[in-house]
Amino acid sequence: MKRRGWLCALVALCPLSCEHLGPRTIVADRVAYDDAVATSWKEQALLNIVKLRYFDTPFFVDVAQIVSGYTLGEQVTPALGFNQAFFPGATFGQRLVGNLALQETYLDRPTVSYAPQTRPDFIRNLAIPLPPSAVLYMMQAGYPVDVVFDLTLDAINGVQGRSVSGAEVRPASAEYRRVVEILRKAQLSGSVGMRIEVGKDKKESLVMFFREPDIDPELAAELVEARNLLHIDPARREFKVVFGAARGSGEEVTMATRSLFRVLTLLATSVQVPDDHLAEGRAPPLGGDPGTDRPRFTVFSGCQKPKDCFTATCYRGRWFWVDDRDAESKRTMAFLMVLLALADTGTKEPVPFLTIQTN
């Protein structure tokens, strides 16, 4: 009976050593790392927005590589002893006692490598204006035209939008707000679109067009109003789109786009700086007249980290956050993440070689 008990215990341990650990970790780990990287990405973007409000230098660090390794170890220690304090007349075998100790070890050893975003192409993409094609691609992809234009355009065909220079804010003109309002209606109805045309010289040109047949007569009249406000031919339905700050011809639309750095600077004006920081001169007060522009992005500040926040970061001893109930700010933040991803293009710097222990 003793021998049978020992054999049963050893057989019971065998499945532990044969069980596959790796496949069961993929789902849990992938989701966990995805959430962690996305959370840190948002916090980094918010931190750089807050830094710009304080005239500090933004900086980006990329998660270059994640390698996760697991080690499962088992150790079985048998012990045999002789118990003298036993009932009188016990045989030698009855006085023998034994035990079996099982020790399992589970080690998770993730290796994360980081890379500062100092590549020339990344810095250049932050500094140069976005191409008009990127703006219209975002609109074509379904991003609201009012969000896209308000964040990425200084002017459209000479009609001035909201602009920021340092801490001075210039509101968008009434004509600009009306044009964006009409284009948003056209976007929702599917009456506006864009395409790429290739000319005889093999050069590509960007064309924005309006689908006016069979649309609501009221919307058709508003689209004519928008073309008049933009000083383009109201009878035309297709227009070439080019980069420029000045008004183009009646057959083309110019777009004065912003760089990603200016997009971040614009969002920085929505940071609520603590009063004592303003009084101490740590951040400048906003100048100019914001007009009637409703902010699409709001960053709150306080001494304690809130429990219900979309993303938060700590800077200079204060917490700054985007409220999780502020859908407009969350949508703006999500669009900013796409713009930052567009800037992170080009040749990647080689990641470091990692030596991974396999036993």
Protein language model annotation of sequence segments:
Residues 3-7:
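N-terminal export leaders
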Residues 19-359:
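N-terminal amphipathic/basic membrane-interacting segments and domains
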Residues 14-17:
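C-terminal motif of bacterial Sec signal peptides marking the signal peptidase cleavage site
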Residues 9-12:
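Hydrophobic helical h-region of N-terminal Sec-dependent signal peptides
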